[in-house]
Amino acid sequence: MSIVELESRIAALAPEPRAAAERIFAVSTTTGTLVAPAEMRPWIEKQFGSVDAVTSQRIVRVTDRVTLEGALFNDLRAKRPMSVPEKSGAEVAETIRSTENDPFCSVATGTPADDFGRIRGALGVTASNVAKYDGYHGVLVFNTHDPLAPMDAAAIADHLATARKWAEAAVLRAPAAPYYFLMWNCLWRAGGSIVHGHMQMTTTGGMHYPKVERLRRAALAYAAEHRRDYFDDLWLVHEAIGLGMTVAGARVFATLTPVKERELVVLGAPGADEGAIAAGISLALGALRSVGVVAHDLALYRSPLAADGADWERFPVLARLVDRGDPGNRTCDIGSMELYAASVIASDPFVVARSLHQPVGR
């Protein structure tokens, strides 16, 4: 099964998941063609395997009608020429090793504390971010310097619990800012300015950050129109077409509308806290690592830590993880299409989903 077969796969589903797929997704396939001059043929064959591979290209477009997130899939994009230094994996390992004894390795003297102090977990301790982008903006510094060290469900759970305690302390200080957001930018390619393993946390007021609030409103609109839960239907579709699996109650799937390469989504049950998806996050992280991903972004969406008068009843805790590419690659993975139109994706979600069944090094 591949993404180019998506339309026929949906058409063959049982009535309930097929109806959900048709409610949520708009799927279309188009063909791109070109005429290659004879002078280019040797280069094309070397780069793409054959001239036929580029002469006629199938592009699959998937749009989530509810959230208006969308992706354009063409696996040929993965073979396009880019400036990638050799041995970038070895260079990453050397960079991690050479940055030991950085300020995060001495948290007490190398980082500031928040005005409520530090929160300590078994595997990490919090600090206050020096250059903030919200009133409370903290860092969860891992005890282990290497951000690529294996991380099982227990380790994920410990980090999530420590970060949550930080957020609760922040909300006690600033009750008007109950919206908690957690992120993990792993390595410089993914936006991490410090190599040492760390997550970041913020709390904000007024409403949740726009992308979280937009998702909440979209799900409510879907429920009002169809009398169905958007997140349950989203899972129903992905599971039915073979893109998802469950682990310890968490629903993990390779999304049909990834923001960028190899995006995995982890859904909890409504009312559950983030600890309930620790095993799912560990599975997703291990799946990415099993296919060589080292630079990734992770975001945690959840309801506010105090009632705000809005309807969050059916909003589940969820995590999104995405591959940001080879740290040694000088070509940026984000361009004008991703910023202003739709994501252009080279990785097939069905291939990504297979990695969920054979992750290593979690």
Locate predicted features:
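HIT superfamily nucleotide-processing domains
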Residues: 1-362
